[in-house]
Amino acid sequence: MALTLNFINTRPAKKPGGLWPRVSFFIRAATLTGILISFFALTVGAEEEYVEQMFLNKKQALQLAFPGVKKVKKKKVWLSDTQRAAIQKILGDQIEYKERRVTHYFGLNEAGKPIGAMVIGNEIGRSYPITFMVVIDPDGTVKDVEVMVYREPHGWEVRFESFMSQFFGRGASDPFDNINNITGATLSVRSMTKGVKKAVAEFQVIYKDKVK
């Protein structure tokens, strides 16, 4: 006759709220702490990226744009829907034109005639705006481009003449898609190209084509 042994489990049953719930709680707490630390690290890192470098103030920009000129005329234009549409047509589909107002500074000769115009623009680079000036000859072509204020630790090479000179002589009807890139400054290059193209398009529509 086979003998069957029945073993009785004498260990007490685990009570709810034992070890595993506590471990799970600590895991969740550690995960949340890690997320918060990462968030604050990213926030601090973003703040540290803001490095403002001023190369030209407004007065210096005007002197550079119009050397020797004794009188500068400021002209502010509120754009009509027709003007904005004409500017948008020049810019094409890749640039969305959102401006409602444009301010130009005109250097005047002794006879009171404009020898050129300057516009100050702002375009977002990687995270912060690049403030720049564009000098435009009476024929609507670019004479000079200068970075006035740069606010990021990378991409500042766009302020060099070796890059900026690519814009010289270009007008509203000229291509801007063949501007050479700078390694490590792609976003800044795009922003400057966009800003200069907008400047010549505005000048063409307002003062050359005289669209109302």
Regions found by a protein language model. Give the residues of each.
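Intrinsically disordered terminal and processing segments
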Residues: 2-8, 23-32, 36-131, 138-212
